[in-house]
Amino acid sequence: MSDKKWNPELALAAGLLSGEVTSAQVIEARESIQATDFADLRCQAVWRMIEGMVDDGIDINATTVIRHASKTKLEKHTGPIGPFIVECGEPAAPFQCLEDILDASKRRRLLAAGAELIAAGKDTGKL
């Protein structure tokens, strides 16, 4: 995997699972990492939520992130966060499996964009 480009989604998930992502690191990283740096919409939502948790003084780890996602109803829009974090952060997963996860993420984004276009067309009566 060393010849592949750095993937922020996998890094965030792996960091949450390993306990390497802490509140202090999030505060430090805010200057260089934006939600839009993540290609996956779920990661964007999770990163924004994590920033809010840090602002509220909540410790950051996989458990608190998953619980907070459930409390704030984030999962209603993103789907289950726990399985997503585990899938993305599984260090023993073969690289092909990780690529498949990312491909599935791209498909979800395309479907979501298509649904938005269809909805916009219905709103304007052009469909």
What does each model-identified segment do?
Residues 1-106:
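Noncatalytic partner-interaction/assembly domains of nucleic-acid and motor enzyme complexes
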Residues 84-88, 117-122:
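Short amphipathic helix-turn segment from helical bundle oligomerization domains
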Residues 92-95, 111-118:
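Acidic/polar active-site rim loop that often engages polyanionic ligands
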Residues 112, 120-127:
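Non-catalytic interaction/clamp surfaces of large macromolecular machines
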